[in-house]
Amino acid sequence: SGKPTFIRF
């Protein structure tokens, strides 16, 4: 749920 989709979807 943020900008880094590879860390937090």
Swiss-Prot record:
The UniProt record lists the keyword Ubl conjugation: no
Modified residues annotated as Phenylalanine amide in this record: F9
GO biological process: neuropeptide signaling pathway
Protein name from the UniProt record: FMRFamide-like neuropeptide AF5
GO cellular component labels: extracellular region
Entry's localization field: Secreted
Family: Belongs to the FARP (FMRFamide related peptide) family.
Keywords: Amidation, Neuropeptide, Secreted
Main localization, broad class: secreted
Organism: Ascaris suum (Pig roundworm)
Domain of life, per lineage: Eukaryota
